[in-house]
Amino acid sequence: VLMDEPLGALDKNLRESMQYEIKHIHESIGVTVVYVTHDQSEALTMSNRIAVFNDGKVQQLSNPSELYEKPVNSFVAEFIGENNTFNGEVSDISGDECKVKLSNAEIIASAISVKSKGEKTTVSLRPERALIEPSEKMDNMFSGKIEEVIYHGDHTRVRINLLGNPEFILKVPNST
């Protein structure tokens, strides 16, 4: 079954409800469904496997959690979900981690698609992975200036000028 943007004209609440309904029907009848969408959240919700295309070529084919947590390149990382990025140069590689030298700091990052020291690279960090004033010491602790705070109901979006990136975004869960 091919479904090409079937929920595009629906309002947000109905669209989300229909996503779950379609997923449950698909699972109960056991047929293969190719679901075409430009809505990344919808793709993550509806799919067992997701293919991300760029210029007609598959960039990554994997399950939703692997696609979101371990994108194979910067295109996939930026296409699926929000990202904060820093450009730098790999200064050290040790196992599955590397150090990336920025113009004003050094970041410890996962060594995804990193081949050698001296290589130019982009570090990506999801807004929900960053913390404001963590309770304990950890890697990659930097000071920044809060530029904007916007309440979104389930979370607060905080824009910070951090390490020369004036558009660094954090999503802070709101407590009950």
Named regions from a protein language model:
Residues 31-34, 85, 155:
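Secondary-structure boundary/capping residues
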Residues 83, 92-176:
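Non-catalytic connector elements of ABC transporters
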